[in-house]
Amino acid sequence: QQFSSQTLAKLTCLNPVQLRRVTTVLNQYQFIKTSRGKNGGYSANHSTASIKLSVLYRIFVLEKDSQQRIFTGHEQSDCEISRNIAKTMSHYNQKEHRVILNFYDTLTINDVINDTLQEDTTYDTL
C-alpha cells in the first residue's frame, strides 16, 4: 500500500515535514519505496518489515553529527574530577549505546507493528 506524505502524517500523527526528513533517510538506505509525482508516495518494500531497530538507532541516533558538547570538565584542570569526568561519562555513554543496540538488535519493524496493533486490545482485558 502506498501513502502520500500528508496521508502518512495524518495516520501517524506526525508533522509532514519531520516525516519527510525521516522517509528521505529511509529511502536513501532503500528501506522503503518512494515514488514521485502527482500520485507519488511511500510504501514498504521486501525488506522493510525485517529491518532491525538497531540499524535505525545507528542511523538516526549514533550517526547524527552532533556538534554539541555533552560532557563537562576540562582535561587540563587541576581538579581531578573536572579532569576525568568527561572521559568517565563518555565510557558510560558508550556502554549505554551497547545496551540499547543489543536490545534493539532483537527487534524488527514487524515487531513494532505487531506490538502497536496489540496495544489497542491489551488494556481492554485489564
Predicted segments, located by residue:
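C-terminal regulatory/oligomerization modules of transcriptional regulators
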Residues: I70-L126
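Short beta-strand "wing" residues that participate in macromolecule-binding interfaces
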Residues: T34
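Minor-groove-contacting beta-hairpin "wing" of winged helix-turn-helix DNA-binding domains
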Residues: K38-N45
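Key DNA-contact positions within bacterial/archaeal DNA-binding proteins
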Residues: V17
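A short alpha-helical element within helix-turn-helix/winged-helix DNA-binding domains
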Residues: Q2-C13
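Conserved segment of winged-helix/HTH DNA-binding domains
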Residues: T48-G73
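Short, hydrophobic-biased segments on the C-terminal half of alpha helices
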Residues: T23-T24
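Glycine-centered, phosphate/nucleic-acid-interacting loop/turn motifs that mediate DNA/RNA or nucleotide
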Residues: Y29-Q30
